[in-house]
Amino acid sequence: MQPLLEFIDENVFGGMTGFVGPYGQRRVIYCDYTASGRPLKFIENYIRNYVYPFYANTHTTASATSRQTTKFRQDARDIIKKCVNAGEEDAVIFTGSGTTGAIHKLIHALQLRGKTIKRSVVFVGPFEHHSNILPWKETGVKIIRIQDNRHGTVNMEMLEAHLRKYRLADYNMYVAFSAASNVTGILTDTVAVSELCHKYGALSFWDYASAGPYLKIDMNPTPDGYKDAVFLSPHKFVGGPGTPGLLIAKKKLFRNPVPGGCGGGTVLFVTRETHLYLESIEEREEGGTPAIVESIRAGMVFQLKEAVGASVIEKREDDMCRKAFEIWRKNPDITILGNHNARRLPIFSMLIRHQDSGKMLHHNFVSVLLNDLYGIQARGGCACAGPYAQDLLGINETTAKRFTWFLEPHQQDDVEKSYKEPLEIMKPGFVRVNLPYFMDDETVHFVLEAIDMVATHGWKLLPQYQFDPHTGDWEHRDFNKDKVKRVFSLHDITYDEAGGNINTSVPKNYHATLEEIAQSASKTLENAVELNKEINTLQDQKVEFLDDKNQLIWFLQPNEAQFFLAAEILVHKPRAPLIRTKLPFKPETPSRMNRKRWPDIHQIQAYLRRMKEEKINNTEDVQVKANPNANGPPVKQNQAWTLPTEAKRRIISKRRAKMTRKSCAMQ
């Protein structure tokens, strides 16, 4: 690796921090940068030595401290503008705690209310985080979700069809897409999409929460490919914890003369009866005492990313993706979600299957096991991208509604007493890890091999764990009985006349090599049968229902794992049940993605022939459902693809020409 990448890796706080788990001491291996970055010693040292000594409020420059603090904050804004190629027409606004705050700020500026809502439409992409869906939904505006195509990227034909349709209807059109998925890391061609948007008079808004720390952000790459707004969460950058959200947007979008958070710092003059807001959008939209140190830190993390270079990061991450697929594609127990050939960041969401039962290992169990065995900090769940997660898991709307039953409180007399509260254990999900570009090769290999090992043998440790059906949390049966003593607390701090006291020991580093940790984990997995002998889980707590809801239990439970372990002892090999469990959903795999959801020319032509006979295909767009392959029979699908009118006309024209030639030949 480059020396600068090694410098970053060495400066991460907690890089060698140890903790005690059920299988001994482990070192923190952080693989959750997609959720949040980690602080850097270099940046925090600069803030402690240079920023804090001169810290003051920025709403004046009359004193040395306020003047210096104002200078630091303006430097941060200027650095960010340069890093994103912002022009004079662009504003950089620090706001909220992340992308969510930035989106709310933009929505307020657009004045989406009253009659404007009825004539506005927002197109969201296939990968969207809830932060880029829910704020738009709550305005009452029409929302249309653009699907992905067979390559796993944005379906540009579908987007263009809708843009054409709503331009003719004279709608205000907003396209709010993610530059990269926080689930699969798959990238979107932001320039191509922006150019298409502007061709039809739409505004292009971009969520860079996942992509921002790694990809080049260019507000003005081409004359027509400019971005109207970008939302950012700098806390996801390495060194970024404790930074505000960022909204970078064209100044013309701020149509609302009243700022999103009016108050101190937003006005030029206030009388007893009137007030005058500031002309500067950046000042007017940052009401109250701003997040001063946080903004300065944001400028520093952008400065660091620019020093590394987006091209260096991209090359490093491409290499990480290649290594990951080389190892994991050989393991039949691992299903990596999303298209494997699409350009992506090294963000991987996966399912772990227990082959003999046909069930999955619960994502929270896998995450806990990676922590306990290897120290790997992963994340389980749906990554706050529910619609995309359901696409990837193969969960249609009907099945999703069936799962919703488990997440609602029940008061009916016919519901078992223990199940009246929501059962989050039943919520489908996946395990997500990401590999930061500055992680050294040895650690990358350690993480890849650890996941491969857990995927193959992790189920054997299920009997040693128990779950809370209401929260979905998993914990080791014996180790966590005294878990309260194993975490730090602010209540450890006390004060007396002499000063403050911290009544606990400082976290210590753990210097065992990665090879030693891997060997310890392997030994634990090899001894799983012996470790489970004293545990009787056959009559243990389990999820079970009296009706057809049992068919929705998709994960292997501890008592079931004990049964399979007993089978291994008796016959010296895994023994599958007579009937393998049929999962209530089928996750998308590359082979399944190529067979469904996207129309082929044969079905389009057949559909248009029927429409022509019924004389209804001349004015409206046609909804064409997917065909599994060019020669196969149609399949039932919940999703539809809109065929543009021009494409229909071309097909009809070709067919007419072909029929004319046949007619001439017959004559």
Label each residue range with its predicted role.
Residues 581-667:
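Extreme C-terminal disordered tails of eukaryotic proteins encode short linear targeting/docking signals used
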Residues 1-615:
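Pyridoxal 5′-phosphate
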